Structures are given as C-alpha cells and as structure tokens.
Amino acid sequence: MSRDTIAEVLTVIRNANMDGKKTVKIPSSNITENIIKLLLREGFLENVRKHYENGNYFLVLTLRHQKTKKGTFTNILNLKKISRPGRRIYSTSKKIPRILGGIGIVILSTSHGILTDREARLEGIGGEILCYIW
C-alpha cells in the first residue's frame, strides 16, 4: 500500500492548527518541500527549518498565528486534498477553479513544478490539482 505524503502533510498541519500548536514537524521529501515553500511564500507559514534526526530529514514548520481580542487564530482556515492516488484530478489552465473568488489558493503539480493557481494561469499551463487552501 502506497503512502499519500501530501495528504499526510495537510492532515498534520490541519490537526496542529485545530490544536493551537505553534510548531509542527513533518517528514521531508521533494514534493513536501516544494509545497511548504509555496505555503511560506503565500504567507500561510511563518518559518520553515530543515532538521536532521536519526538518519532522516524533517521540516519544522512554524504556523502563522494572529492575535485578536477574542484570542488567537491562524491564517489557514481550511485545507482540502483534491487529487488522490485512486482518483487523479487534472485541469487545463482555463478551467482551474477559483477558491472564494481568488482569496484562497489552489496548489497544482505541473510540468513546471508545484505552482499556485495564479502562477499556472499566468504561464498558461494546467496540471494535477493537489489541494485547496482557504
């Protein structure tokens, strides 16, 4: 049985978010590093460090929290995995969905690497829809 590393990463971030944790540690791979770099660039994460422990590399993520009068909340409200190993979802550049009218982002795996929906539309390429974040 194969592991869906993207789903595992999204679940770890979602659970840490709901639990109110500031940092979370996930296993490192090329695709997870690219997705995490994209989340950092889009402002959903505060910091990322690569950590070596017991012969394996891990990414230590610092989640971005904001303080309000009612308490703290995070920037990532929802993470939803779309394409999965049993059912891959592909889209052309013209049919990439807009999440909340452009407020959320769609992460795609393209021939040019891991891109957001805006970057893929600008380059005019489609690909596999990995997840929605809003």
UniProtKB/Swiss-Prot annotation:
Gene Ontology terms describing biological process: translation
A Pfam family matched in the record: Ribosomal_S8
UniProt keyword list: Plastid, Ribonucleoprotein, Ribosomal protein, RNA-binding, rRNA-binding
One Gene Ontology molecular-function label: structural constituent of ribosome
Quaternary state and interactors: Part of the 30S ribosomal subunit.
Primary role: One of the primary rRNA binding proteins, it binds directly to 16S rRNA central domain where it helps coordinate assembly of the platform of the 30S subunit.
Protein known as: Small ribosomal subunit protein uS8c
Protein's organism: Cuscuta obtusiflora
Biological classification of the source: Eukaryota, Viridiplantae, Streptophyta, Embryophyta, Tracheophyta
